[in-house]
Every structure is written in C-alpha cells, then in structure tokens.
C-alpha cells in the first residue's frame, strides 16, 4: 500500500515538470548533464542519446519538451539533425557545445535553423564553480522549453532615413530568442544610423561569430566590441560574451566602450543593466534603448534609468517575444514608454533619434 502511495506521489510530483532529452556523443557529458539537470525540481530528464538516430527514436517515443543538443557528433552532425527535425516535428532546442572557431560559426547556423539558445559546454573540471554553472544551464533549459520557435510572420519594417545628430546612441538588450530577433531587425537600420550597442546573453567566444554573421546581413558595420572603442555612426558593437561587462563612458565629448570586470548581474555577464545604467549616466537624453526577448529581469532597471534621464525607451511585446521575461519586467517597472512588436522597434528608435526629443515623463502615463 505504501509503495503504491509513493508511486502516486512521485507521479504527481512529475506533473508539470519540463521533459528533457539530452543528445551528446560523450557518455561522460550525458551523465554530467543528466545529474545536473535533475537537481532542478522543474526538470525531468526523460532520456539520453549518443547520436541522431537514437535521438530521433526517443523524440518520437518520449515527446520531450526540450532537447539539449551537441553539434559535433558522428554519423549525422548536430546541425544537420536539428534542421531535419525542425522541418518535420520542431522541438525547442538548446545547443550545448564546446567552443572552437568552427563550432562558433556552426552554432550561429543552428540558431538560424531554430535553436533557442546556446550554452558553452560545462567543464567537468570546474570544481566548486560547477553547481553555479549548472544552475544557469537549468534555468536556460527550462526557459527554452517555453519559447516560441518562430517569430510571427509580418511585413518587414521599412528602413527609416537617419536624421539624428552624431552623438545620439541606440542600444539593444536581449537574451533567449535574441539571436533571431536581432538578426531580423538589425538589417533595417540604415548604414549611417547612430552608433548602436548590443548586449546579447551568450557564452564567451560565440559573440565574435555572431558579429560576423550580422555584419554580412546588415547595412551598418557590425563587430565585437573591444575596450576603448568609440561609439560611432554606422557601427554596431556587440558586447563580448562571458567574461566582462560592457559599459559606456563619456570623456572629451565622445563615448567609448569600457569592458570591465565584475560579478554576473541577474546571472548574466555581460549584463544589459550594466550597459543601460552606464548609458543613462553618459548620454541620458540622447539615447534610444529597447529591451527584447529573454528570461529574467536583466535590463529592466537600466531601461528605467535611461527613461528617467530623458532617453527614449521601448520593449518588445509578448506576441513577438520568444520569452516574455525581460520585457515584462520592464513593463512592470514602467521603464518602457512603449511596448512594441519586434518589427516596429527599429522605426520607432530611428524616429525618436530623428525627433531628438526627451521622453514623456513617467507621470504622463499614470
């Protein structure tokens, strides 16, 4: 009788848990991920697979809510496998990959194929830091399972002719779903738009590949930011992933990038909040900033600081967000003067810069 009751309680405990399938050719990595993910009560590891064919069978049998996928596997590589099931039976997928230059480029193609997030494969020798790493992995896998797999269809936004002065600055912050969102909207900023700064939550090393992919798509030049870079018209600077925060300082009438050490903020480094807060101090009323799709709260407080400094602030709406977490936090703080569809954000940012007007006061929205 007690055994039956225990089974019933266990079954009830599993209800509502996110079902995870782990796909990796390394038995050691599969075991480490399974153990780590199982520490989160929201997650249930329902299976593991060493390659594409085994994974395909388990996906059909187990119906996972989310897949973690290694890109470098024998027989069929992870990218080819991802493309195959995203076309026929899409499942939210988190790429968990070791970093090489080749894997960075492949990871970007995986995001274009529909993967929701990229995580650098945890080092099994991380020692005391491994639990913190796995907490972040658990949170991102859980969030990925809730992400929309495709942006809503819609007409592409029309480019807006630049009309702002050279010292205006645009800024964007994003997390889960941000690679796809940024790839969609950045090409619509004209070549001589005001300098544009981006923090996208991404592991160390992958942002360089992301910048190269965007540079091929965009009218503006795009590259990974370096310490001391000037914020210039026509240039998009992507915060390097993983190790440091990107802040902006004004000196001698110009704004420069500073890459600074510091603990993660809202579990993130680089942090959107750190960039936005520095922009509020350095450029205040000559900033237009938008907070895009992502889990958590990073960026909401910084967006509010920009608004209070007289800058123009926007957030992505729920309908076009893969994960409506960061924009929701901004809405709850009343940090965004407008909540917009993703496709409307470039035009509104450019119009705000061209008008060069201060944001409406917070009191005006009461």
Curated annotation (Swiss-Prot):
Domain of life according to the entry: Bacteria
Entry-linked Pfam families: CheB_methylest (PF01339), Response_reg (PF00072)
SMART domains in alphabetical order: REC
Its EC number(s): 3.1.1.61, 3.5.1.44
Catalysed reaction equations from the record: [protein]-L-glutamate 5-O-methyl ester + H2O = L-glutamyl-[protein] + methanol + H(+); L-glutaminyl-[protein] + H2O = L-glutamyl-[protein] + NH4(+)
Annotated Response regulatory domain residues: 19-136
Modified residues (4-aspartylphosphate): 70
Broadest EC class assigned to this enzyme: hydrolase
Active site: 175, 201, 298
Function: Involved in chemotaxis. Part of a chemotaxis signal transduction system that modulates chemotaxis in response to various stimuli. Catalyzes the demethylation of specific methylglutamate residues introduced into the chemoreceptors (methyl-accepting chemotaxis proteins or MCP) by CheR. Also mediates the irreversible deamidation of specific glutamine residues to glutamic acid.
Entry protein name: Protein-glutamate methylesterase/protein-glutamine glutaminase of group 2 operon
UniProt source species: Cereibacter sphaeroides
